Each structure stands twice: as C-alpha cells, then as structure tokens.
Amino acid sequence: MPLSYQHFRKLLLLDDEAGPLEEELPRLADEGLNHRVAEDLNLGNPNVDIPWTHKVGNFTGLYSSTVPVFNPEWQTPSFPDIHLQEDIVDRCEQFVGPLTVNERRRLKLVMPARFYPKVTKYLPLDKGIKPYYPEHVVNHYFQTRHYLHTLWKAGILYKRESTHSASFCGSPYSWEQDLQHGRLVIQTSKRHGDKSFCPQSPGILPRSSVGPCIQSQLRKSRLGPQPTQGQLAGRPQGGSGSIRARVHPSPWGTVGVEPSGSGHTHICASSSSSCLHQSAVRTAAYSLISTSKGHSSSGHAVELHHFPPNSSRSQSQGPVPSCWWLQFRNSKPCSEYCLCHIVNLIDDWGPCAEHGEHRIRTPRTPARVTGGVFLVDKNPHNTTESRLVVDFSQFSRGNTRVSWPKFAVPNLQSLTNLLSSNLSWLSLDVSAAFYHLPLHPAAMPHLLVGSSGLSRYVARLSSNSRIINHQHGTMQDLHNSCSRNLYVSLMLLYKTYGRKLHLYSHPIILGFRKIPMGVGLSPFLLAQFTSALCSVVRRAFPHCLAFSYMDDVVLGAKSVQHLESLYAAVTNFLLSLGXHLNPHKTKRWGYSLNFMGYVIGSWGTLPQEHIVQKIKLCFRKLPVNRPIDWKVCQRIVGLLGFAAPFTQCGYPALKPLYACIQAKQAFTFSPTYKAFLRQQYLNLYPVARQRPGLCQVFADATPTGWGLAIGHQRMRGTFVSPLPIHTAELLAACFARSRSGAKLIGTDNSVVLSRKYTSFPWLLGCAANWILRGTSFVYVPSALNPADDPSRGRLGLYRPLLRLPYRPTTGRTSLYAVSPSVPSHLPDRVHFASPLHVAWRPP
C-alpha cells in the first residue's frame, strides 16, 4: 500500500504527537527504511516506457528555445552622458579621508578595467546582428543599428575607423590620450613604412582644432615643416581639386571597413604628421589633419576599382557613387517595389559615415566581429523599450575559456544578520550601471560588434539572391535585393529614421569603450565597484548602513528624516563621482526592505510575494505520475531551491529531485511526495537573524553513543546499532536542541556546523532540518568539549564549561570598514542632529 501523506508527515516527526525523539530519530537514519519509503513514494524508478513531459506551466527545458517576441514599436532607451570621473579615488578621499587598502584596490580595478582573453575568435561581419526574428529581419536590423549608434553617441562604444584607429564621442580619459607613446603603439609593419610614425603627436586631436594648431603640430614633428603644410592647413572647405567636387564630403577619410587593397602608401591612419611626403589629397584623406573643420576629406577616389565589392562600399565614393544605397538613384526602377523609389524620396541622404569627436590609435583591429547582438524587451515589466543583448560567450567556452574571477555574494543568513533590523530603507537605481565602468582601449579588438551593411544582410537572408563576390558592375545585381517585403519595411522605417536609413545601411564595426554585459568579467567588476563605494559611504556615515549587490544599492537609517538627509548626501556624492542615478526609480521601503528577491524586516527574511505566487502556480501545474524531463526539473528545483530555507525541511526535501537531475533521468512525482512538497511551500517561516551570545549547551557523539552537557547537567545515551560518525553527531545535536531548547549549541563536527543536511540519509536530513531550524552552532575542539566524556559513557568526570562567545557572521562581503582617523586639515564634517548618540554598528 503506498504511503499516505499523513503517515509520511508522522514518519518525519513533523507532527506533535511523535514518540520520544531518542527512539524515533535514529530510526530515520536506517538505510532500509529510507529505501522502502523511496519505493513507496515512487522516487527511485524512472518509468522509461511513458514519454517524458517537457513543459510544466511556464517551465520548459533549460535549453528550450523560448522565442522572444519582436516589437516593431520598441523605443531605444536614451543613455545619459555617463562619464565616471577619473580622479574617483581623490574625490572619495575628500569625502571620507584616506581610503582603506581594500577600497583603493577595488576602485583601481575599474579605472580602467582590463580584459585579457587567451584566444579571440573573429567572426565575419554577417554574424554581427543575429537573425533572431526571421519575420522582422529588416526592422530588427535597423532597430539594432540605431541602438548601437545611440551607444556610440553616448560614448559607450568606439567606432573602428581603420586597422589601427578608432573614434569615439564623449570626454576622453587620460589613458586614451597617451596611447601614442604608451605601450599600446603597435609598430607599423614594413609595408606601412615605419618612418612616418610621429611619436610626439597626441593620440587625440579634436575636430575643432584648425589651422594654427596643426601647423604647430607639424613643426614639432621630426620630419620638420613640409611644403605641403600651408597648403593643407589653409585650404577652404571642399578644396582638394577636381576629385573633391564630385564626392560627398565626409570629415574623415577612413571609414569602418578598411579597403583591403590599400598598399604601402596608406600609413598609420592617426599619426598627425604621417605621410607628409605624399600627395596632398591622400594626406587629407588619411592623416589626422583631416579632422580639422577647415577641410573635409573624401574617400579614396583614386584606388576605387581595386576593392572587392562588399568590403568597403562604404567609403569608395568616387565618380561612380559606389555607395550601395545611393547607386539606386541613377538606376531604372526594376518594379513598383524597387528601392530606387525610396532613395529618390529626398536629395540629401547625408554622409555615408559619421565620425566621433576624438580619435585614438588602437591595437590592430580586424574588420570582423567577436560577438553577435540582438534586441529583446528591456525587462518583463517594460516591453516598450528594448535592451541590447551582446553574446560574447566565446570567451566562456572551449578549452581556451577565461576563468572569470570569483567574488563573495552574501548568503541568506549573512544578509539577514546584516540587514534585518529596525531601520528605514530606501533603494537607489543606478541607470545603465555596467556602462559606467571604462575599459582600456587595448580590450577593444576583443570586444567587437557591428554589421556588414544592409545589402549583405538582406542578400544573406533572402533565398532568391546570392552574394556576388566578383565585381558588381551590372544593375541587375544591384536590384537583386529589391523585394516587396524590403520595400514595405523600408517605407515604414523611413517614417521613424528618415535619412538615417542611409547611414545605417553601411557596414560598421564598433568596439566597447565601457564594459559590456555579455562578458563574465563585468558582474565581477560592477560588484567590486559598488561595494567599494558603499564601504566609503558607510565610513562617512557610521550610524547608517549602505549595502550593494551589483547595481542594487540600499541605504538604511534609524528614522525617515534621517534617511532623507542621508539620501540627499549620498546622491550628491555619487553624482559628483559621475555616477548616474535614476531619481524616478528610487524606492522607499519603510521598515521592510525588498532586496535580492527577499523581503527583509526586523522579524527576519522571507521570499518576495511574486516568488511565492510563482511557486503556487508551479504546484498547480505539476503533473502527478508522469515522468518529467530532468531539464524541466532543473527549472523547478531552481525555483523551489530559492525558497527552500524558509520551509520546514529545507533543501533535504528536494534531494530526490537533485538525484534525478544528476542522473539525467526523468522524475515522476507521486501524489504523496507532491502533497508533501506543496504543504512545505504553503507555510513559509522567516529566517531570523542570529544573535550573539554565550554557548551553554554542548553535544558530542561516538558511533555507538551520544552525550550532552546542558549547563551543569550531563546526559548520555547509546544507539541501538553503531552509526556513521557524522550521523551520530547530527543526532546528538538534535537531542541537545530538543532537550534544552537552546539556540546556541557547541559541536566539534564540521558537517553539523555547516548546517547542510543533504548528505545524510534522506528522512533524517528532512527531520533534522526542522528540529535544528534557527539553531546556531559554535565550534568546540574535541579536547575541550564538555560533552566528550558523557558520549564515551563517562558521567563522573566533569570538564569545566567553556566561556564560548558566539558572533554571527555577515559573510565575506567586507561590509563594515572601521573608519581611519580623519586627518586634521580636513574640515570637520557637520553632523545633522543624529537620532543616535553612538555610532551604530551592523548587528
């Protein structure tokens, strides 16, 4: 007869009318009983003959393709001009006095962040934008391009201008300026002619610098003043002779994809005085001088015909405008859906490429990408805005994978010990937190995103046209991409983007200037950065609490008025460092804080309501007596595991599920096991914070017997049959708890100390978890354990009771930094009337 739920509860001693613990509990350690119960609950036999269930409610297998939904109305979020101040360490020191070694080290990690992959695999540009939405190819292409353009404009990306140079917008950092003579200068190869490289020229020359500045630049160069200099610096807009007249002026010569046909004449693009011994036109097109507003340079009309058709359509704008988009202007319409109808809508489509305000030399950057991008909803609650997903998973795969640094995340108990208090809470929202942290330009060649341009993208995805790799002179090839779908999409997009359609239809390669989200290094760096800032804030306001996990920052203070003034001070401090906060998203929580999926109040911690609802839904949809795919079980265990510490039996209750996942077997829920779990998760108990105290109760065991020391009382007992030592120690701890009711127990067994009961026999683990819930353990060396003698059957010998103080842990999260004395020359910080006379320390 299968085991009923009531009987099972009784077996686990979850009901009050159980017999004496010393008799009942050791029985649960019996292997035979555990096997019989497992068989009764149908836990151990995978029914292979029934097909597996692959979906339970919203849970599908871990690798299932849950298709993201494309939204043609997505708004691209705006990115404020995020610029973290470079002298962040000095600013923090002005705020709080000398920084601790820990804080300084963490802030140095992100100014600038560095990234050293072992191997970087370069992918063709076609893979730049992932064809995630086959129904909305063109729309997705333009939305993604617009998103990337927005990021570039906000100073978050570099734009590759040529193999060795990149441009960007926003304020430059010092390491972006001394790249010329820093270690990053890659010696130009022989075919590039080393002589022309000018070491004195600064890495950045803003576009606004005109004439005189350039002349002085040239005088400094070791080539000396050249005859071309006057002619170049003083030429009016649109100067360089006959070639210039026929082209669209673009302020810089080299664009996204470098022409593969360039010979030895194109010398390192950004050194300001390079190639002065060459023709004026070519110098204007290639050297940095062309950034000045005095004369905008053109593409390389001279070598137009050596380019393969797709590598650099973008910049060859000579007598035949070989820009794919503009070529439609002179062609005959092939049908009513021909693209030339769109191109002829306006005369001025703007430049083929835009260039940043600053330009730097970079290590060699191929015309490739290293990761693909696509768009998804910003989050489940906000489907109007899009979010860019960057896939740099190549760095986490294979045997060349980068092992990302590990960092401490507080566990549930540490978090409760720290934050469970009677403070008022408020949480800050850092907008685009990852994009605050600058990356060293040397990392740019490893983190490239981009696209091959609209023509390639459409050609690759449409079945009827082929990518033509030979010369594409004929108009027929040009019109290969015309189709009704493309025409309709572009007409609709024209309303949104206007003449930007032209700009976005060109190939582009962008590298990250701030840390991207798709790299395992980023969470680590963000955690280091915010925890260092919180440490500084905690030392500046010792009677308050500031704590962060990634971009989630919470502030706590004794009263609401106090909290508001703290909020004002901290906000101003963070703004002065260049951090961007989102004031609309500041949440005031009162006395119960919502953080990391938990609700934390003075009573302890519970999971947030939406997680409780998810669990209820999961049990409603859970099928009985049907084998469930182990990948779906992973999802179920992930959800239940989060709330397990709040249940009676905790993680041990989920052990059968874990075992199945490890064996990659399907799992079948019997009605009793499902009812048991459901009951467990319907009544959640808060995890309370641990209190410091003195340990008065000690437990010890040998394989054959147990002993307790409760105050001056000693007790002992024997087991019916010898047990493994860990099991015996666990039983002794349970007896100590049930006999004395003490919340602090001394033990010399490390497994019991760890409070992880999943390695014990299943039934015993479940029962012990409930008996020992809320108990704290203190380690006592065996030699000093007063319960050692009773456990060996000797009651006559009394060891003196130890004075064992217990201090709850707050984990390795460097939460509380003791403030160093403030040097005398700093003005005394003015304290508002604090509700506390003494500095408050975390509990």
Curated annotation (Swiss-Prot):
<keyword id="KW-0511">Multifunctional enzyme</keyword>
<dbReference type="GO" id="GO:0052170">
    <property type="term" value="P:symbiont-mediated suppression of host innate immune response"/>
</dbReference>
<dbReference type="GO" id="GO:0003677">
    <property type="term" value="F:DNA binding"/>
</dbReference>
<keyword id="KW-1090">Inhibition of host innate immune response by virus</keyword>
<keyword id="KW-0540">Nuclease</keyword>
<feature type="binding site">
    <location>
        <position position="429"/>
    </location>
    <ligand>
        <name>Mg(2+)</name>
    </ligand>
</feature>
<keyword id="KW-0255">Endonuclease</keyword>
<feature type="region of interest" description="Disordered">
    <location>
        <begin position="297"/>
        <end position="316"/>
    </location>
</feature>
<dbReference type="Pfam" id="PF00242">
    <property type="entry name" value="DNA_pol_viral_N"/>
</dbReference>
<keyword id="KW-0548">Nucleotidyltransferase</keyword>
<dbReference type="GO" id="GO:0003964">
    <property type="term" value="F:RNA-directed DNA polymerase activity"/>
</dbReference>
<dbReference type="GO" id="GO:0003887">
    <property type="term" value="F:DNA-directed DNA polymerase activity"/>
</dbReference>
<feature type="region of interest" description="Disordered">
    <location>
        <begin position="219"/>
        <end position="258"/>
    </location>
</feature>
<keyword id="KW-0378">Hydrolase</keyword>
<keyword id="KW-0695">RNA-directed DNA polymerase</keyword>
<dbReference type="InterPro" id="IPR000201">
    <property type="entry name" value="DNApol_viral_N"/>
</dbReference>
<feature type="site" description="Priming of reverse-transcription by covalently linking the first nucleotide of the (-)DNA">
    <location>
        <position position="63"/>
    </location>
</feature>
<dbReference type="InterPro" id="IPR051320">
    <property type="entry name" value="Viral_Replic_Matur_Polypro"/>
</dbReference>
<feature type="region of interest" description="Spacer">
    <location>
        <begin position="178"/>
        <end position="346"/>
    </location>
</feature>
<keyword id="KW-0238">DNA-binding</keyword>
<dbReference type="InterPro" id="IPR043502">
    <property type="entry name" value="DNA/RNA_pol_sf"/>
</dbReference>
<dbReference type="GO" id="GO:0006260">
    <property type="term" value="P:DNA replication"/>
</dbReference>
<feature type="region of interest" description="Terminal protein domain (TP)">
    <location>
        <begin position="1"/>
        <end position="177"/>
    </location>
</feature>
<dbReference type="InterPro" id="IPR000477">
    <property type="entry name" value="RT_dom"/>
</dbReference>
<keyword id="KW-0239">DNA-directed DNA polymerase</keyword>
<comment type="similarity">
    <text>Belongs to the hepadnaviridae P protein family.</text>
</comment>
<keyword id="KW-1113">Inhibition of host RLR pathway by virus</keyword>
<protein>
    <recommendedName>
        <fullName>Protein P</fullName>
        <ecNumber>2.7.7.7</ecNumber>
        <ecNumber>2.7.7.49</ecNumber>
        <ecNumber>3.1.26.4</ecNumber>
    </recommendedName>
</protein>
<keyword id="KW-0899">Viral immunoevasion</keyword>
<dbReference type="InterPro" id="IPR001462">
    <property type="entry name" value="DNApol_viral_C"/>
</dbReference>
<dbReference type="Pfam" id="PF00336">
    <property type="entry name" value="DNA_pol_viral_C"/>
</dbReference>
<feature type="region of interest" description="Polymerase/reverse transcriptase domain (RT)">
    <location>
        <begin position="347"/>
        <end position="690"/>
    </location>
</feature>
<dbReference type="InterPro" id="IPR043128">
    <property type="entry name" value="Rev_trsase/Diguanyl_cyclase"/>
</dbReference>
<dbReference type="GO" id="GO:0004523">
    <property type="term" value="F:RNA-DNA hybrid ribonuclease activity"/>
</dbReference>
<keyword id="KW-0945">Host-virus interaction</keyword>
<dbReference type="InterPro" id="IPR037531">
    <property type="entry name" value="HBV_DPOL"/>
</dbReference>
<keyword id="KW-0460">Magnesium</keyword>
<dbReference type="Pfam" id="PF00078">
    <property type="entry name" value="RVT_1"/>
</dbReference>
<keyword id="KW-0479">Metal-binding</keyword>
<keyword id="KW-0235">DNA replication</keyword>
<comment type="function">
    <text>Multifunctional enzyme that converts the viral RNA genome into dsDNA in viral cytoplasmic capsids. This enzyme displays a DNA polymerase activity that can copy either DNA or RNA templates, and a ribonuclease H (RNase H) activity that cleaves the RNA strand of RNA-DNA heteroduplexes in a partially processive 3'- to 5'-endonucleasic mode. Neo-synthesized pregenomic RNA (pgRNA) are encapsidated together with the P protein, and reverse-transcribed inside the nucleocapsid.</text>
</comment>
<feature type="domain" description="Reverse transcriptase">
    <location>
        <begin position="357"/>
        <end position="600"/>
    </location>
</feature>
